[in-house]
Amino acid sequence: MIVVSGSQSQNLAFKVAKLLNTKLTRVEYKRFPDNEIYVRIVDEINDDEAVIINTQKNQNDAIVETILLCDALRDEGVKKITLVAPYLAYARQDKKFNPGEAISIRALAKIYSNIVDKLITINPHETHIKDFFTIPFIYGDAVPKLAEYVKDKLNDPIVLAPDKGALEFAKTASKILNAEYDYLEKTRLSPTEIQIAPKTLDAKDRDVFIVDDIISTGGTMATAVKLLKEQGAKKIIAACVHPVLIGDALNKLYSAGVEEVVGTDTYLSEVSKVSVAEVIVDLL
């Protein structure tokens, strides 16, 4: 098995190759003057199985690059390709929200199913998207890695999900932290006032670990942090698998009172402090 890196996951691919005790295949990436993407497999390929690791932070570039890498590898005699897309782009457009919309991940699933033999990702936003694929679709969970990272940073914490849909993440983290877990519930007090508080637990005088699969604009989590602080919470650490963090998301979170924001290297950002390399190796 050879490990091939896309341009957006070079460090992560190196970590995976090292754990697998194999050399990272040399790939050249560049752009033509008109901005079209160029890839070239530089090393000689003497294996019929390849793993491409290419996260999809710059979504459209990553998708085209992956298609080109697959084509180049097939030409070099590779028979089986596993695509590891730690952050799988377009996964949130998993249904029609308005008439006439494309179901983006379904369209891409058809492409992936024709060019690779297996797809691996980490914490997809909705797991039912596996049904769009006609190849094995495997997903791993990086929440335990996030929980391990904060284990010595919090004192007798409670673990909170930002909503009921993320409760499973809180439950997973709570087992590692040996802590109680809950989710934040919104209660409308009036037409203009909403209260956000843990469903059953009391955050007063407690350290808090809030965990979700993705932080995008940071607005919802920042509001929750601010209200938890007002309710007497002590240290608050916010964590997510995919730190998309659009615009001033980090500023919102720190201004609201977060002590630290933690993410993984599925989506490289300044808070990507936890690697999913071991999770990927376990899935391979």
UniProtKB/Swiss-Prot annotation:
Its main location: cytoplasm. M.jannaschii PRPP synthase is more compact than the PRPP synthase in the B.subtilis subunit. This is mainly due to truncations of eight residues at the N terminus, 14 residues at the C-terminus and to a seven-residue shorter loop. Keywords: ATP-binding, Cytoplasm, Kinase, Magnesium, Manganese, Metal-binding, Nucleotide biosynthesis, Nucleotide-binding, Transferase. One of its GO terms (molecular function) is ATP binding. Belongs to the ribose-phosphate pyrophosphokinase family. Class III (archaeal) subfamily. Optimum pH is 9.5. The activity declines strongly above pH 10. Transmembrane segments: none annotated. Homotetramer. This is Ribose-phosphate pyrophosphokinase. D-ribose 5-phosphate binds at residues 188, 212, 216-220. The active site is at residue 186. It comes from the Archaea. GO terms for biological process: 5-phosphoribose 1-diphosphate biosynthetic process; purine nucleotide biosynthetic process. The keyword Cell cycle does not apply. NCBIfam families: PRK00934.1, ribP_PPkin. Its cofactor is Mg(2+). Optimum temperature is 85 degrees Celsius. 70% of maximal activity at 72 and 95 degrees Celsius. It is found in: Cytoplasm. ATP binds at residues 34-36, 92-93. Binds 2 Mg(2+) ions per subunit. Mn(2+) is also accepted, but the activity is less than 15% of that obtained with Mg(2+), when assayed at pH 9.5. Its EC number is 2.7.6.1. It holds the Pfam family Pribosyltran. The gene is prs. Activated by inorganic phosphate, with a maximal activity at 190 mM. Above this concentration inorganic phosphate progressively inhibits the kinase. Completely inhibited by ADP, and partially inhibited by alpha,beta-methylene ATP (mATP). Lack of allosteric regulation.
